[in-house]
Amino acid sequence: MRLRNKPWAKDKIAAYPQYVIPDPEARRGRWHELFGNDRPIHIEIGTGKGKFITEMAKLHPDVNFIGIELYPSVLVSALDKLIESELPNVRLLNANAKDLTSFFADGEIARIYLNFSDPWPKKRHEKRRLTYRDFLALYDRILSADGDIHLKTDNQSFFEYSLVSLSQYGFVLAAVQLDLHRSDIVGNVMTEYEEKFSAKGNRIYRCEALRPPQQS
């Protein structure tokens, strides 16, 4: 993904601490205080320009959403959507997914969305894939006992890799769609990438994976 440089992005993000939380470590285990309720928390890793998370928040006011994006020049687009919509159940983080356990306590998150993650196709970059086992270990920690992961991609190789990685780690595959837009799934909210890829006729792959059963 080629990113357009926006040198003003960090300053704009800093100007809206009510939307882009500047100190997520201080919120660890206390995100419900920020939202002012005990509703479940869903996070999107790689929230991009924010179309998915803002639309989901409108459709599901009974859920709190946190979008995580590494690149400030991308996150400002999500911030603009949040400023315009003033959705009370969305917050954003300009952060790296490697630090998830610094931001969220064990069992604090009900669902993780991985939408069109970078597939990092080269073998030497395997550890960067968001479904590599080291990332799955982070997800396992922050997910609640009945928590799950929802993944979508147009990259067949990455999808197949993810299914194997999730299964080997112990996640339970609860749903697998090999052609999402020709399936019977209801209520699918598309991301910017999903609209772009599906318009080209690309097949969209999707799966749901339940957190590994815990030893009693």
Curated annotation (Swiss-Prot):
Family as reported in the entry's similarity comment: Belongs to the class I-like SAM-binding methyltransferase superfamily. TrmB family.
Name of encoding gene: trmB
Binding of S-adenosyl-L-methionine, residues: E44, E69, N96, D118
Binding site for substrate: K122, D154, T191, E192, Y193, E194
Entry function: Catalyzes the formation of N(7)-methylguanine at position 46 (m7G46) in tRNA.
PANTHER family registered for this protein in UniProt: 3-DEOXY-D-MANNO-OCTULOSONIC-ACID TRANSFERASE/TRNA GUANINE-N 7 - -METHYLTRANSFERASE (PTHR23417), PENTACOTRIPEPTIDE-REPEAT REGION OF PRORP DOMAIN-CONTAINING PROTEIN (PTHR23417:SF14)
Active site: D118
One term of GO molecular function: tRNA (guanine(46)-N7)-methyltransferase activity
Sorted UniProt keywords: Methyltransferase, S-adenosyl-L-methionine, Transferase, tRNA processing
Listed name of the protein: tRNA (guanine-N(7)-)-methyltransferase
